[in-house]
Amino acid sequence: MKIKMPVDVRMIIDRIEKNGFSAYAVGGCVRDSLLQKEPNDWDICTNALPTDILRIFQGFHTFDAGIKHGTVSVVVNSVVYEITTFRIDGEYFDNRHPENVEFTDDLITDLSRRDFTVNAMAYSERTGLVDPFDGAYDLELMAVRCVGNPVLRFNEDALRIMRALRFASCYNMAIEKHTAQAIFECKNLLKNIAAERIVSEFNKLACGESCEYILRRFKTVFAEFLPEITIMFGYEQHTPHHNKTLWRHTTCAMTNIDPEPLLRITMLLHDLGKPMACKKDPDGTAHFKGHPKFSAVMARQILERLKYSREFIDDCVTLIAYHDVRLTGSKPQIRRVMNKIGETNMRRLLKVQYADLMAQSMYKRDEKLEKFNFACKSFDEIVKEKDCFTLKQLDINGHDLIKMGITDGKQIGETLNKMLGMVMDETLENKNSILIQKAKEINSL
């Protein structure tokens, strides 16, 4: 089995071997190559010590920040390559990092400490594929299987739970039976992992091809760091608009939208407030008036706890708050929504509403789609024609009003906003001379 390695990777391995050591491409780059995917990066393992690597690559730009764990980074043609000495990990006391590492001369020993069989393969042109744990076979089966005892692997590093789920979602892989059992058994260990690390994996998982299946099968695992979602499990919506439980609707809506973290997380949280907003008719039909507000408040709390960026949180909460706005296709209405949330979020909102609609029942679907398509058409025309929906686009500004003798700041703001509303509603033309005349009328000048 031959893998085509980049020229610079071959050069690094050749250089190490010419100095009397062995070296291999290892881990994800080997896995992706066997899957016929372009690796994001190439990692190299070797029996050379870090001091040997620093000597061998004298004259190259090197970093030794990871030298404690045996890693030296070498820069070749502006690309950073991590070269790590074969090692044995010491005991793990925090479910994340080994307390110490011990270097070894044995490749198989090094591979045995890795997380999954598909990541425990090494390759060099001299030896070919080194695969002591049948990772290539698991790749053929598209299976995620831990190296050795899965409970031990997850206790060593609980983030491996999220990595297993991410691989399954993004690579459309199955999780091997014993590995899956261990994930459920060890899920409480996720509480020991920093929010930023969980979010990094979860964002990728949420954008995976198989995220709907993974979110549904392993829902109790995700509830370890998202306990708020448990209220959606098995929650019947009792409305003709929905034929799925709230959790199934949510996961279905996620896969209906572009695989971007902001959009996928928005769909994950968009209906979280429904149980709190639920009111039922005497016949048992449920209504969820005001649920976007509940969902938005809960989403902000969750995203802040998980340490998402401020921009991400604000955009996500905005989309959730507006996701149930009934867009008629009226241009004045759409301009006013754009005024509140901006053009970029309006474009996202249309994607959110479509994903939500397509995860609902067939009840009135044609009617809903007709209105939705009309709204999209109106939005596209507003953007194309550069319609005014912000004060910045208004063909008059505060300086014009000051020249007219209006100097009070509050009065200036009220005048401009009143005229903007009229322009958005198409009752006033966005033309400087006309706006000046209207400003005089408003202020009785």
Question: Which role does the model predict for each range below?
Answer:
Residues 1-445:
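Catalytic cores of the polymerase beta-like nucleotidyltransferase superfamily
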